[in-house]
Amino acid sequence: MVIGRSNNHVFEFLSDFNNFEKLMPAQVTDWKSDGNSCSFNIQNMATLGMRFDTRTPNSHILIKSDGKVPFGFDLQCFIEPVDDNSCKTRLEFNADLNPMLMMMASKPLSNFINILAVKLKEVCEAN
């Protein structure tokens, strides 16, 4: 998705978990964060924790599962400049799910990531 802000702006926003609360859908409760990690509950699903693993300035962020989580996962944020005032951003979620959990959780997780992406565009372009 193309966001009408520079890759630096989007990278800086995504580099602080305190900003992620603005991206969370209504189903997320019990949000806790500091700059480098967060935890939250997705209603009727699970409590998840995340932490930053690697950050490549203005282009890539790797976030990994953290703490007691029902499955291991990572979230990658790819950010490519389009021009000085816009960038192409892609969120990629990978989860280590057994086949049964995959059937139950894949659609809600996909919806969750899609909501994050839409809200990321809205919030970044509004600021």
Q: Language model features by range: what are they?
A:
Residues 67-118:
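Beta-strand/loop substructures that line and gate deep hydrophobic ligand-binding cavities in soluble
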Residues 121-127:
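Short, highly charged C-terminal tails/helix-capping segments
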Residues 1, 40, 50, 63, ...:
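Preference for bulky hydrophobic residues occupying beta-strand positions
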Residues 1-32:
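Hydrophobic ligand-binding cavity/cleft-lining segments
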Residues 10-14, 20, 52, 63, ...:
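Hydrophobic pocket/interface hotspot
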